[in-house]
Amino acid sequence: MRLILLGAPGAGKGTQAKFIMEAYGVPQISTGDMLRAAVKAGSPLGLKVKDIMTSGGLVSDDIIIDLVKERIAEPDCQKGFLFDGFPRTIPQAEALVAAGVNIDHVLEIFVEDEEIVSRLSGRRVHEASGRVYHVKHNAPKTEGVDDETGEPLVQRDDDKEETVRKRLAVYHEQTEPLVDFYKKLSAESSDSLPVYSRVDGIGSLDDIQARVFEALKK
């Protein structure tokens, strides 16, 4: 199973990715992990990446694609792989096709923006323990304080409504066009691959998981 997982921040991709990895025995691959691993390994490509990152530059799509090809040639990718957060843009998707990297399935977990804003902006965290609450769905016994210590809860900057809306805007601008790209690619390919599926990301974890695995059978 060679899979691309799409979905806005807060749509629940990370949780479903774990289920998919366990069921299919495939690794999750993100560009951030690949870049860090390449730098740590000190490969020629990794040294090039380190120079770019140290100077504050952006790693080019060409280098990212080379890293992808290196990564998916490793033994743990024999059964396939799960791309999370990659490709992000049409040029990256086109480069993936040009490099001959085949994909079986593109799965989008869809949640409306307002639901995501509610999910993320309602989170409150006890920083010392990492305990996470939600003002609506998992409220502390006393508003604003941790159940166990009585210490104050905080809203992380990433979870503030303004930040969430900005991240969603970037997602819609950059990543949504990928859906049309892969639908078109599927329609034009002789084997109808990759299969594109959209799954409703609202409901219990079990319900969403069932929808995901049903979609992946197509």
From Swiss-Prot:
LID: annotated span: 122-159
GO MF term set: adenylate kinase activity; ATP binding
Region (NMP): 30-59
EC number: 2.7.4.3
Domain of life: Bacteria
Xref: Pfam families: ADK, ADK_lid
Regions crossing the membrane: none
Record keywords, A-Z: ATP-binding, Cytoplasm, Kinase, Nucleotide biosynthesis, Nucleotide-binding, Transferase
Residues noted as binding ATP in the record, renumbered to the chain: 10-15, 123, 132-133, 203
Main location: cytoplasm
Entries under PROSITE patterns matching the protein: ADENYLATE_KINASE
Subunit composition and interactions: Monomer.
Function: Catalyzes the reversible transfer of the terminal phosphate group between ATP and AMP. Plays an important role in cellular energy homeostasis and in adenine nucleotide metabolism.
Domain observations: Consists of three domains, a large central CORE domain and two small peripheral domains, NMPbind and LID, which undergo movements during catalysis. The LID domain closes over the site of phosphoryl transfer upon ATP binding. Assembling and dissambling the active center during each catalytic cycle provides an effective means to prevent ATP hydrolysis.
HAMAP family: Adenylate_kinase_Adk
Protein name: Adenylate kinase
Taxonomic classification: Bacteria, Pseudomonadati, Pseudomonadota, Gammaproteobacteria, Cellvibrionales
Designated gene of the protein: adk
